Amino acid sequence: MAHITRFEAPWFLMISKKQYKWTVRPNAGPHSIEKSIPLAVVIRDYLKLAGTIREAKHIIFDGKVLVDGKVRKDYKYPVGLMDIVSIPSADLYFRVLPDNVRFMRFSKISADEARYKYVRIINKTTIKEGRIQLNLEDGRNILVDKETAKNFKTLMTLKIELPSQQILDSFTISERSYAIFVGGRNVGIHGIVKNINLSKFKSRKYSVITLESRDGNTYQTNIMNVMSIGREKSDLRVD
């Protein structure tokens, strides 16, 4: 199905549900339909670079739009959290950040900042010749040797260079680390991790994280909703 009704679209899409009956349906890709925005909608409704979907398509088909450092000519390409959207010809660069009101927002960044992406490890897989594959949240995979793989654990955040995927740094969810909520009712809240309540009878994914925001308020959520983005301070701009 190429389109969906606007009433069936994810609640956070910044589109008028009264203006038109249909909207673009994201293609299958690195993000689920429920947590992504079609590239044409990004260009028209979020970045305001086009007045219609047709105009947005022209911009995309001309190869002017990059997602994570690669030209994307699919107007239904799914854009999700922490993706980098670039229009170099217009000197425009954006990072998709979690937002407490609209779930996702496009934060303007510099061309230098657009060279880096932050993404969580969802699991590790052993492949041929004993090498380890790090499977990341946005669908990409990175191969490392067994010794290097010992440094990386599930739910760690990797800072990678685009589009080479070279690992530049990594961040663990630990007390005093800096994190941001990427899911749950407090999505978008960020601050210092104050406590990690590990489940005694269940796996680590049931752990509860307590975070203190910059205004001194504390929030709790499941560890699956948390992304580490720094050690004692954020490694990226989140405001």
Curated annotation (Swiss-Prot):
Family annotation (InterPro entries): Rib_uL2_dom2 (IPR014722), Ribosomal_eS4 (IPR000876), Ribosomal_eS4_central_region (IPR013845), Ribosomal_eS4_central_sf (IPR038237), Ribosomal_eS4_KOW (IPR041982), Ribosomal_eS4_N (IPR013843), S4_RNA-bd (IPR002942), S4_RNA-bd_sf (IPR036986)
Keywords, alphabetical: Ribonucleoprotein, Ribosomal protein, RNA-binding, rRNA-binding
Annotated GO MF terms: RNA binding; rRNA binding; structural constituent of ribosome
UniProt keyword Ribosomal protein present: yes
SMART domains the record matches: S4
GO biological process: translation
Gene Ontology CC: one annotated term: cytosolic small ribosomal subunit
Cited Pfam families: Ribosomal_S4e, RS4NT, S4
All copies of domain S4 RNA-binding, residue ranges: 37-99
PANTHER family registered for this protein in UniProt: 30S/40S RIBOSOMAL PROTEIN S4, SMALL RIBOSOMAL SUBUNIT PROTEIN ES4
Cross-referenced NCBIfam families: PRK04313.1
Family: Belongs to the eukaryotic ribosomal protein eS4 family.
This protein's name: Small ribosomal subunit protein eS4
Organism annotation: Saccharolobus solfataricus (strain ATCC 35092 / DSM 1617 / JCM 11322 / P2) (Sulfolobus solfataricus)
